[in-house]
Amino acid sequence: MPSESGGTGPPSGLPRNQTGWRNSIRRYGSLSIGLHWLMLVLLATVYASIELREFFPKGSDPREALKLWHYMLGLSVLVLVLLRLAVYMIGPVPRIEPEPAAWQKLLAKLMHFALYVLMIGMPLAGWLILSAEGKPVPFFGLELPALVGENKDLAKVADEIHETAGVVGYWLIGLHAAAALFHHYIARDNTLRRMLPLRD
């Protein structure tokens, strides 16, 4: 593949399996890769914190601490997904080789759209819940402004949506992981390798 300098190797003398922080036609750059795996860790921690709170009595310090981390890390996901979208808009999307069937590409687009809706919508719903309950919205020592005034009915509806989206999220993340493994081990294309930090 031609590089920016007109040669056939990676730009700037980088090894063949590295393309710097920006995406290339062959693979994702280090920034996209880092954001992807950091968001995976954050999502796992967000889910774990809200599930583990059930092991502690209401009002206890461990339960409240887990809820606090759930709020803050959930909002961190929102920040990172917006950054990831910005990176996506300024760089190419690496090609999948060999090219998958049209139906697989369509399913992949739908899956990614659903994941982005989830990663943006769920933190916003959580922010809305706290706002409508009249509670502070904590974010690593800061208090974010309320999205709306106190409204218990709205808080209840937002909470139901948030919980339903959380269940849907388990399925979406699981399907996303299963699809990556399918492409790697069955289709044997570079879908997963494009997002791995060390190898191509």
Predicted features along the sequence, with ranges:
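Membrane-embedded alpha-helical bundles that constitute the cytochrome b-like, heme-associated redox core
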Residues: 1-200
